[in-house]
């Protein structure tokens, strides 16, 4: 990965280089990598949309397959930015990330423009949903659930507009020795085995521990705080054995799992890269909208090598 001139490397004094300092820096490292990769093909302060994600899309790990994602990496170093969005009769969310992987806002079906600003910046006139960031650079990530209406979703993209957001995109990233990186990554991999996804992401610095945040970022970068999204990760079967690609499993989704206006999704990923798994049927997830529930309100989802079975993936 070539990070180009947008990445400023800062050597660390030996006394400062510790496993803990690496763990605290890791979310920033990953955000900068993702930002600079995106900026190689896109303009700061503008939107790029994925369409329906398939296994070839490696922009973000653990994506949802029946969602049209919109990405906009921006900088408010030179002043606030104003974001306007379309009106949508299904699920639409706007998540705002800073470079520390804080998520200061997740706004579902916005009803007014969103103002992105630093705490020291003056408020412009107008009625806004105000979001303050801890860093100049950040990401707006939009999600529009697709329910056999991709054409309408695509047509609404032009209504996502950002005024401003074209400031300085340089972001410092600290360097570490290979030994420190190896030791710190081993710590992250250990934390991943027991981290509660509900505790992995916060709105401001200090909401979650630096250990949980580092593990959360490695497990699923651009994850969202638990008051908006609840994550559940299943890596083993009911005997404790790792899930296998040549086996068949049945997952039961409980009734009453989500609030009015929300929905559930179950997605299958490869354990090696956390991306969607290629399959002939091109079915990568099951959601409230693409599953047939049971009479008791639960939903049975079948995971198998050929996608057979009720609500199969």
Predicted regions, residues:
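Cleavable N-terminal signal peptides
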Residues: 2-3, 13
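N-terminal signal peptide c-region/cleavage motif recognized by signal peptidases
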Residues: 9-11
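A compositional/structural signature for long, glycine/proline-rich flexible linkers
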Residues: 15-313
């Amino acid at each position: 990965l070539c990070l180009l001139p947008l990445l400023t490397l800062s050597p660390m004094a030996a006394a400062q280089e510790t496993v803990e300092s690496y763990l605290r820096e890791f979310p920033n490292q990953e955000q900068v990598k993702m930002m600079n990769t995106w900026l190689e093909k896109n303009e700061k302060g503008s939107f790029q949309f994925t369409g329906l994600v398939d296994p070839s899309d490696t922009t973000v790990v653990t994506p949802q397959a029946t969602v049209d994602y919109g990405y906009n990496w921006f900088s408010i170093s030179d002043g606030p930015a104003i974001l306007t969005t379309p009106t949508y009769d299904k699920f639409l969310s706007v998540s705002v990330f800073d470079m520390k992987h804080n998520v200061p806002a997740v706004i579902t079906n916005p009803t007014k423009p969103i103002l992105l600003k630093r705490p020291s910046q003056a408020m412009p006139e107008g009625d806004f949903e105000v979001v303050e960031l801890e860093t100049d650079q950040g990401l707006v990530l939009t999600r529009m659930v697709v329910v056999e209406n991709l054409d309408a979703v695509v047509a609404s993209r032009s209504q996502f507009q950002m005024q401003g957001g074209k400031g300085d995109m340089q972001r410092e990233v600290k360097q570490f020795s290979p030994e420190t990186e190896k030791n710190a990554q081993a710590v992250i991999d250990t934390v991943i085995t027991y981290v509660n996804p509900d505790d992995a992401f916060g709105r401001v610095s200090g909401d979650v521990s630096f250990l949980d945040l580092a593990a959360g970022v490695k497990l699923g970068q651009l994850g969202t705080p638990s008051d908006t999204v609840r994550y559940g990760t299943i890596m083993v079967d009911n005997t404790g054995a790792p899930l296998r690609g040549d086996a068949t499993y049945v997952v039961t989704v409980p009734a009453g799992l989500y609030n009015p206006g929300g929905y559930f999704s179950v997605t299958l990923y490869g354990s090696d890269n956390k991306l969607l798994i290629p399959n002939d049927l091109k079915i990568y997830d099951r959601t409230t909208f693409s599953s047939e529930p049971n009479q008791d309100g639960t939903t049975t989802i079948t995971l198998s090598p050929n996608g057979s079975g009720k609500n199969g993936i």
